């Protein structure tokens, strides 16, 4: 299994501002099949709370900040995202939660698969059984 990691994206700066971009299979190790974003998350609320059997993700804080907590069934690791030129690669098979959203934060999520409800593991006990196989 590949490991989660922060990937620094290209950043071009000049007096007019900054520009960053993402290229599939270059900056991220998969073809993008779905894109979604999270915004207006109320203070104290968390998102995620599931794992994927097949889907991989790349998560970028386009604005503001938040934490992504990844769990492989043995240990948890927290990644703080707060720069629009850094993203977190999340391999399949990890439980994920997103928390500590700052006011007006915007999370962009790129996915390797189209939406498939059967790919989700939404129960933590079921997830623990899944990773022990």
Kindly give the residue locations of the regions a language model identified.
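Non-catalytic, conserved peripheral segments adjacent to functional cores
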Residues: 1-86, 103-106, 110, 115-133
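Well-ordered alpha/beta subsegment
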Residues: 83-87, 93-100
